[in-house]
Amino acid sequence: MEGIFSLDGYKLNKRIYINLQKVTILTAHNDYYTPVIIFDLLDSYFNKKDFSDTFLNKGVFVSLNEKKLNPQDLIVFRLRPTVNLENELKITKKTILGQILNQKFCEKQDIYNKVLFYLQKDIISKLDEELINYGLKSQIVEENIFNFAKLIEIENYIDENPVFFKEQDQYLAKSLIVNLINKLHTKKSKLLLCELPEYALKEDEYKKFLKTLKQSDNIENIIIYTNSENTNTIFRDIYTYHIVKENSVLGFDDYDRILGLLIEKYNYRKSETEITELIINSIFFEREFKQIFENIDENII
């Protein structure tokens, strides 16, 4: 999905517009509140968390290229600043691992038959031997992975040594979740909301993780909220970036006009490529970024 992604309602002060790309990056210039509201809105709207009449009455509106999106149109995943693997790797209907295992389970009908055969032969039949004396008989009501999952416990190992999930390296934890999301096959488009604060990963881990996101071809759209200057070493497309300030999200969808104004400002001494590099390199440094746009149209960015 690509185009103008529009959001309104909930706790937003006004309608915002995002130039949605394969990877879209939000960075805050003195507005660290709006990006979190955007993620909360999308997470709640598409995952129906606390989705009630109260939420609807707040005038929530989500559209792509002026076409309204309904809650069932997308599958939204959210990667928070710190990943709790213990929660993420529970086998339930809402977790990534649960959805993947259920998909694998349903794809192979012979698994059903094998499970039912041994369940009937080794457990149900023996139970019925006791129950028949009382005019009772047992039966399997439903066969699905989530019932069998109660017998499964996920453990964490590093070099064959068990470790607590909370001790797991955040880079490995985040990479694992992204890879699972990437492997999940769905009929609906997937949107990953990724919060990447500066403190969670080391510099080299951060860059490697961004490459993992960039190479996740089976995730249709990824929105990253970060203020780390290391981001622009991996993503060099100007249209990827959005500045969040004063309750607004400002992108570069009108970049031809922006470029024209800046070429005039620099008296044609800088090429289009040089100006683009200048903007991308300064985008995480608010003061430097403002200096580039001094003395031109204040409303442009």
Region spans (language model):
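The catalytic "switch" region of P-loop NTPases
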Residues: 215-222, 226-278
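Glycine-rich P-loop/Walker A and Walker A-like loops and their local beta1-loop-alpha1 context
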Residues: 2-76, 80, 84, 88-98, ...
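Structural motif
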Residues: 27-31, 193-199, 225-228
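Structural alpha-beta junctions
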Residues: 44-52, 212-224
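Conserved helicase/translocase P-loop NTPase motor core
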Residues: 153-192, 197-200, 204-205
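Conserved Walker B catalytic segment
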Residues: 198-219
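Conserved P-loop NTPase mechanochemical-coupling segment
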Residues: 101-172
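Conserved catalytic network of the ASCE P-loop NTPase/AAA+ motor domain
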Residues: 18, 183-186, 214-218
